[in-house]
Amino acid sequence: MNQEFSDEHRRAAEGSFHAPASIFFLYMDECMRTFAILELESMCMEKIPSRLISLGKRLRKSSIRCLGVKPNWSDYPEELQRAIVSAEKICYPGPVYSEIFEAAGLSVFPRNYYHFLGNKVAQTDLFNLLEISHPRTKIYYGRDRLKRIESDFPYPFIAKTPLGSSQGSGVFLIRRPEDLSQYLETHNPAYIQEYLALDRDLRVVVIGARLVHAYWRIHREGDFRNNIAQGGIISFENIPAAALDFAMHVALKCRFDEVGLDICEYAGKYFVLEANMVYGQEGFRKKGLDIHQIIADLFST
């Protein structure tokens, strides 16, 4: 896509993400644990680059060495410990080390990633705090939830699994009290959102303050969900520049270094529906793109 962005977004993109070529990455997929341990031992004999370090398999297709995660900080040889704490940036450190490194004042990429991964409650709170357009949403705990929800939302409305759901599997259209009662039996807290009658939404992927891909997700007949995993159709036609500008605004304001944003236009206004830190790859495959190579290229420039 060759959409032009505002000068404000361009300046923000240029200033918010720097990835020097001399990158030392720290990562270990569980299925490669033994191999990575051998790599760690052998590299201790070499000079360790000190500018950047990473943990994530997101760069497994790059030429950058990915070493892996140890269960204990003390498991790292002292030379690797020194390289980590002196790094300019630590990439894809995983949920545990991400919080530890940030608490220690180290710079982590991607920011605001693991805490918001699959956490719709935290995402909604962030959008509301930053006054980002988001469908009216409320969280309900405790007793008498059905009565309180019915007093706040007219039927139909949307109910979601607040934590961990993906690919549309935890999204429900609540049409009547019986639907709501069934939802409440298995969900506490209840995540309730106003229903916007849409035939599509726009998935926009932003990495390192760069827009890397965007496509429409159009729902199949008889389903209110636009998710590709639920039968939605991908289209690259007529994507408005204003929608892309809005997505960039959301990513920059929320400090999301890697995110797949679901954007919609309703009643002449753009809304962010959800932030996906793990997002489907079908839209990339349809365009002949490799997300892992895209990320590797971002770090090599």
Set out the residue ranges of the language-model regions.
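Conserved N-proximal alpha/beta basic substrate-recognition cap immediately N-terminal to
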Residues: 40-137
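A short glycine-rich, hydrophobically flanked beta-strand micro-motif that places a catalytic Asp/Glu
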Residues: 256-267
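Phosphate-binding site of ATP-dependent enzymes
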Residues: 171-251
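C-terminal active-site "lid" helix and adjoining low-complexity regulatory extension at the edge
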Residues: 265-301
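Aromatic (phenylalanine/tyrosine) cluster motif
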Residues: 5, 17, 24-27, 35
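Protein kinase-like catalytic core scaffold
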Residues: 157, 213, 271-274
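Short hydrophobic alpha-helical segments enriched in small aliphatic residues
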Residues: 8-10, 19, 30
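Active-site nucleotide/adenylate-binding loops and adjacent lid/helix of ATP-dependent enzymes
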Residues: 15, 23-26, 42, 113-201, ...
